[in-house]
Curated annotation (Swiss-Prot):
Catalyzes the oxidation of 3-hydroxyadipyl-CoA to yield 3-oxoadipyl-CoA. Belongs to the 3-hydroxyacyl-CoA dehydrogenase family. It comes from the Bacteria. It is an enzyme of class 1 (oxidoreductase). One of its GO terms (biological process) is phenylacetate catabolic process. It catalyses: (3S)-3-hydroxyadipyl-CoA + NAD(+) = 3-oxoadipyl-CoA + NADH + H(+). This is 3-hydroxyadipyl-CoA dehydrogenase. Pathway: Aromatic compound metabolism; phenylacetate degradation. Homotrimer. InterPro entries: 3-OHacyl-CoA_DH_CS, 3-OHacyl-CoA_DH_NAD-bd, 3-OHacyl-CoA_DH_PaaH, 3HC_DH_C, 3HCDH_RFF, 6-PGluconate_DH-like_C_sf, NAD(P)-bd_dom_sf. The gene is paaH.
Amino acid sequence: MMINVQTVAVIGSGTMGAGIAEVAASHGHQVLLYDISAEALTRAIDGIHARLNSRVTRGKLTAETCERTLKRLIPVTDIHALAAADLVIEAASERLEVKKALFAQLAEVCPPQTLLTTNTSSISITAIAAEIKNPERVAGLHFFNPAPVMKLVEVVSGLATAAEVVEQLCELTLSWGKQPVRCHSTPGFIVNRVARPYYSEAWRALEEQVAAPEVIDAALRDGAGFPMGPLELTDLIGQDVNFAVTCSVFNAFWQERRFLPSLVQQELVIGGRLGKKSGLGVYDWRAEREAVVGLEAVSDSFSPMKVEKKSDGVTEIDDVLLIETQGETAQALAIRLARPVVVIDKMAGKVVTIAAAAVNPDSATRKAIYYLQQQGKTVLQIADYPGMLIWRTVAMIINEALDALQKGVASEQDIDTAMRLGVNYPYGPLAWGAQLGWQRILRLLENLQHHYGEERYRPCSLLRQRALLESGYES
């Protein structure tokens, strides 16, 4: 089924369809850009023209190359014109029934050797291909927005997809300057599945009134190295879009609790507070937001303090124990240890987050803050919360990545590549897990599961296996 792809058809002239068309045309392909609306096609091509002209102005592209690229774009409103395509990339409605009907029509219009692909972010490739002729030529080709900029493409195989089709799509997207990753058709594929905890744990913290949205975002962004905080990111994506993907994955996994949608996010969607595009979401985008600056400097003088670093993430500051989070509350630790306890959530960067036991004397908590500020840290304080913000979120992402790996969704390398390039995580989750330590991640999730009594935090069996191997190597 290997064919020479010269003509590419793109179905849908919205943001994603236009972006994919621009990519294909920029790499020498004649592109048939299809939409039922001639006006939408005009807007799409005008937008591509404007983007290419901007690159010419900035010296990134020659005027001649710009002109040649635009000449390769052919707007079409008759689906029968797509019979000339070697590859079709559908980027239209994210509804299964619409896609099934469209692909059935494409299977009749296009020759048997034409590769039929969909840019869906989460819909089953197997379901789309199930009732059409030659289902072995159907695959997922999931670009990320904006398509001309983002490197990642998920190449998704359904149950019937031929191996040579996947191979050819990987080679083609590589020639377009993209980084393909291979995965099997499961809900959310790689990125939209493994990324769900980044959003869901932020919503849970907001629901439990652990901290203000800007503190939650600052902790993950400035304390763990994520490019954006989870709540501001949902505002940028669009609350309706992000919520719909979460609901899709949740229902596709038979209401698996790890993917439980948020009632707070649902309220925003119902209320039309969709984020940046509507002006209101988690944040008010009509007004300038103030930066999170951390706690005020503690003016008390606690010097000289006796500081002793114990094993396993414990620092003793006079009578106060500063303990790196392992999934227990500060209150539980303080009562068990009969000492003032401040739990710290830190991973990378200057920002650290703390939570203090309610039984602590105020001076004990202030002493811990003073110590951290003297180390040059920006300190954020949240309510006493097991697993805190950073470690809980990262542990859940790693657990989900391990579950996807164990179930054969994709290779370890492709999962890590997908999360680094698709959502710009500072590390691939599986490499991150090895760096942080499997035993600590397992212990944290077990403590969370015990605290909540929920299956949401159950560690996957591959995490248990890796933690066991790690303990064996260390003994």
